[in-house]
A protein has these predicted regions:
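Divalent metal-coordination and catalytic microenvironments
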Residues: 6, 28, 52, 92, ...
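A short, active-site helix/loop in glycosyltransferases that binds the activated sugar's phosphate group
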Residues: 56-67
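Structural beta-sheet core signal
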Residues: 24, 52-54, 119-120, 195
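Cap/insert and terminal regions of metallo-dependent hydrolase folds
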Residues: 117, 125-227
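Short glycine-/acidic-enriched loop or helix-start segments at secondary-structure transitions
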Residues: 5-8, 35-37, 63-64, 130-131, ...
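Core dinuclear metal-dependent hydrolase active-site scaffold
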Residues: 1-16, 78-140, 144, 225-231
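Active-site metal-binding motif and surrounding structural segment of the metallo-beta-lactamase
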Residues: 1-53, 149
Length: 231
């Protein structure tokens, strides 16, 4: 749950056993990304006036589900760069991406620090649609255009057919296999790419698996719980 995740964050940052974030940013409204925010409310953490940044459609869904009470809601517009709180030391930019938008639209978030920047892209449908939307020819071209040093990208599934008899077109994500095919080996000047958001069926969750070893041999990484990135 949220309390466990905040405990992991606090320990990773040397902040004790728990923390309340200075601000919250949301990419979209699918179940695993928003339902936990209710725990910021009076029944659990007792939060009030926490700055929240999301698109207008995400904020609308939160209000309809009565999840917005603990927050001071701020609409983030795609392409605008802003500081979430005064003196926080970093800026954010929301970047529109296509992803099963039945409830709200979906954004990646670029985090811009004093020395480095990071792209947070946990969910999108496929690279073809995303690259067309942002007007770039390849993943590398897109990352170069943003000047990012790190990219935490959608690694939900390793390959097609991973869900057994379930129709995977109903839960579209670019597979890690497809992403690696498009990227090939890491080249000089490439950002550090870290695959995140792995489903429990993904064999790359096992660091000793042949899949995880192959990914590492190309120069890419799988995200690790509690890791930190200095920007």
């Amino acid at each position: 749950g949220l309390a466990h995740q905040l405990s992991i964050a606090a320990k990773s940052l040397g902040k004790g056993d728990s923390l309340v974030p200075d601000s919250v940013s949301l990419t979209h409204c699918h179940l695993g990304h928003v339902d936990g925010v209710g725990q910021f409310g009076k029944e659990a953490m007792g939060g009030s006036g926490i700055p929240l940044f999301a698109s207008s459609s995400v904020i609308q869904v939160l209000e309809e589900r009565r999840l917005a009470t603990p927050f001071q809601n701020n609409v983030a517009h795609s392409g605008n760069v802003f500081s979430p709180t005064v003196g926080c030391g970093f800026e954010l930019e929301f970047v529109r991406v296509p992803h099963r938008d039945e409830y709200s639209d979906t954004h990646a978030i670029r985090v811009i620090g004093p020395n480095h920047s990071l792209l947070f892209l946990p969910d999108h449908d496929d690279w073809g649609q995303t690259l067309r939307l942002v007007g770039e020819q390849s993943i590398r071209d897109w990352f170069i255009s943003m000047g990012i040093d790190f990219a935490m990208i959608d690694g939900t599934f390793w390959s097609d057919g991973e869900l057994g008899g379930r129709d995977m077109t109903r839960v579209p994500h670019p597979t890690i296999s497809e992403s690696m095919e498009l990227l090939g080996e890491r080249r000089e000047g490439d950002p550090e790419i870290i695959f995140i958001h792995l489903n429990h069926t993904n064999p790359a969750l096992d660091g000793d698996s042949s899949q995880a070893r192959y990914l590492s041999s190309l120069g890419w990484k799988i995200g690790e719980q509690g890791s930190t990135i200095l920007l």
